Each structure stands twice: as structure tokens, then as C-alpha cells.
Amino acid sequence: MRIDPRSHTPIYIQLADLLREKIESGEFAPGSTLPSELQLSQEHQIGRESVRMAVALLRSEGLIRTSRGRGTWVREALQREHIELTPGSSAIARMPSSRERREMDLDEGVPVIEIRGPKGEVYVLPGDQTELIRP
């Protein structure tokens, strides 16, 4: 798959699709480092902003992690915790506070799930590691 600048699909989406395909095929295995922003830009002859946007998209999908000074790497497959909502409970997805992001070690763009129990108790769980089940 090549990046087609004449396509109606934005360049950053094309690059994200290409990288996602390589991750899903195992070409970029969990834990492996992705090429740098500069390398991807040069290899695909696209602007660095398009690379940044593609990386941000994949990060928001939970496929990759980035760290200043360490680069970008493929995340290990996440184990999801199954939470059964009890009658009278409610759940919403929202963006975490800075403190919640730090405490849960969440990547930017990953939401949290806030569950309110029938007695008003509140639980906040990482959205990329939680699956809600209705009874």
C-alpha cells in the first residue's frame, strides 16, 4: 500500500491505515519501535504534520504508545476487565483529568469510564481496558 496524494482520503488517514495494517499483520510486533517521525516522513514523502496526525490517531485507538525521548512503539495486547453493571448503575465515558491520566498511566486520547453505583458510589476505570456488561 502506498500513500496516494491524489486520493480523497486524507494523507494522515492513509498513513494510519498503512501502519495499522503492519501492526495487525505482525510486521510491527508488540513492543517493537516504529520508525521515527522523520523516517516516516521521508519514506512516504509526506509532511511531518501528517505523520504526527497519523501517530495521534493510532495512539487514540490504543495501538501504540509514545514517550518523549523513547519514541513510539506498538502496545502489547490489552486485557479487558469485564464489569457487570448492576441495576440502578449508570456509566459514562469522559476524558480523564491530568491526575487520572497520570495515575492510570493512560495515553493521551484514551477516555475513562465513570460508573455510578445505585448508592452513589463512583468508580473511574481506564476506557481502553474496560468492557461493560449489562445484566
Tell what function each PLM region has.
Residues R75-P135:
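All-alpha effector-binding/dimerization core of bacterial HTH-type transcriptional repressors
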Residues S50, L57:
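Residues in the helix-turn-helix
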Residues L38, G47-R48, L63-T66:
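Hydrophobic alpha-helical segments that drive targeting, anchoring, or assembly
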Residues F28, S32, E61-G69:
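Beta-hairpin "wing" of winged helix-turn-helix
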Residues M1-I46:
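Extreme N-terminal segment that seeds HTH/winged-HTH DNA-binding domains in transcriptional regulators
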